[in-house]
């Protein structure tokens, strides 16, 4: 649809789980999930999103569900290894308070799909974007662990300053905003966080 509306637009899509240097990599627009943004880039929020803790029923049957943040130390926690984020750290929000939990990773990978696969196989607890695990939760393949805790992880578009007035970047932003709001589980996000989100 984007290319139909803007036939002169040239697109190259790269999918990576690690943050890129926009200038060095010659990237016009980078889609990032998470509120820990580099202050040296220009960012625009595209849509609200959160990450939640979840595990497979087989893991919960074997190990039980954690009863508190401290209890997470007794569990097998799976982490996405990011170059600019400390491995083994979760920043969880509860009742308007942020809690930083530092854990020893049981397994880690720089690929979020691998972490999701390990979790589905019952290897431990992961923190993952709600929109990416919602179907697994509905089907019972994953269970929501410690549902009172979550991490704010909005979806942002990030671009270099030289493209501030770029019509092609604006066209991409407008398209992504409209598409994401229709795709993301806003009602579920509000139910978990007790916040009312402005879609834009």
Please report, for each region that a protein language model flagged, where it lies by residue:
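Central regulatory/effector-binding core of bacterial HTH transcription factors
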Residues: 1-39, 191-195
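Short beta-strand-to-loop elements that line the ligand-binding cleft
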Residues: 11-15, 101-111
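Hydrophobic residues within well-ordered alpha-helices
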Residues: 22, 72, 117-122, 137
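Paired acidic/hydrophobic, glycine-rich loop segments that form the ligand-binding mouth/hinge
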Residues: 29-32, 124-128, 144
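Flexible hinge/capping segments at coil-to-helix
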Residues: 40-50, 55-80, 95
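Short beta-strand->loop
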Residues: 43-46, 139-151
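Ligand-binding cleft/hinge of the Venus flytrap
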Residues: 88-102, 136
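C-terminal effector-binding regulatory domain of bacterial HTH transcription factors
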Residues: 130-139, 149-200
